[in-house]
């Protein structure tokens, strides 16, 4: 009897418990579930790698741009330095030989006046003799009004000083007399410098006179612009041969003059005869 009750009690208890479980709401899991996808992770990694690659590329481009700008700045700076160096060298050449000592105005003028003759006389004018002799020997001389004439324009060269560049050299020969003239200077300053070069080299003038004597020519006149240069006097030693040659030349010149005079007289008589004939 008690066993039956116990069995019924257990049955009823099971039934009750089962009923309770059925009537009660189902249990729910309130935990948040996160789904991890390997594909999403890989995509994020690729995006991160791509962004890092882009960042590196942009950084590299920026670095290259900065380097290019720096190179251009350095190149411009080097060109400016080179130009300044050239200008400085030109300035140094322009003032080569000049003293940078500060001198008062009056003292400076006196120093220039005192030093000028020394600087001028140091320039060699041997080229004048050379060009005159070569012209007399080799060039064809035109004849104008009974005088033989040569005119040269002096170009810039290593032998011609700057004071004579662009000037005209005129040689006029009349018989055995030769006249030398430098003209057509750029300005009065150039003419004055050229005149100083000639007058401060008397020994070379003497050499020119002697050289022309060897060509049976006498330097009669030497002028630079409107300045007439005083010629050195050279004593001529007369030898029997010189005297004979001088006598022969004198006779030839006299015969030539007589012949020209006779020709003029004959022409005059012939003209008067023709006029008389025409009148008749």
From Swiss-Prot:
Residues 12-25 have a biased composition (Polar residues). Residues 41-71, 249-280 have a biased composition (Basic and acidic residues). It holds the Pfam family DUF5421. Transmembrane segments: none annotated. Residues 1-83, 248-280 are annotated as: Disordered. InterPro entries: DUF5421 (IPR035359). It comes from the Bacteria. Belongs to the chlamydial CPn_0705/CT_671/TC_0042 family. This is Uncharacterized protein CPn_0705/CP_0041/CPj0705/CpB0732. It comes from Chlamydia pneumoniae.
